[in-house]
Amino acid sequence: MFGPITIPFGAKMLFNTLRLKPGVKMDDVELALGEMCNVVKNTYGGDKGGFIAGQVFKFSGFVSDEGSLAEVRRADDHIAIVTYWRSFEEHERSHADAVFRAKFAAMAEMCSDSKELGYDLLWQGEPESDGEKPSQKPS
């Protein structure tokens, strides 16, 4: 559950931000979030539905001055759910399923907004060891 993940080149990444309602804390959403993530992992993983891997992040309150262009550098409490899929179509099929929709509805009760955006993977890398040649983009 807390081990490293491997993302194949060409994977589709979905970035979902869930803004928590005022007064809702991480402890309040933890069970609903865990149940929702388990449904995705166990029901749609691999050949069952195209789910590759996922990560959940809690906003720490940190906003980078160096990486932010806007004058106002603040953000509301939110959770980021990052999932990796073989295709956008497989993602959409999984989320149209009644079991997932019920779990997502329970999570949505505690949120004021949710936005899920899809991305194509363009680059990935890790620090190179001495003597190691740079990896080439697969053809």
Question: What residues fall within each predicted segment?
Answer:
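Short S/T/G/P-rich N-terminal loop/turn motif that feeds into the first structured element of a domain
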Residues: M1-R101, M110-S139
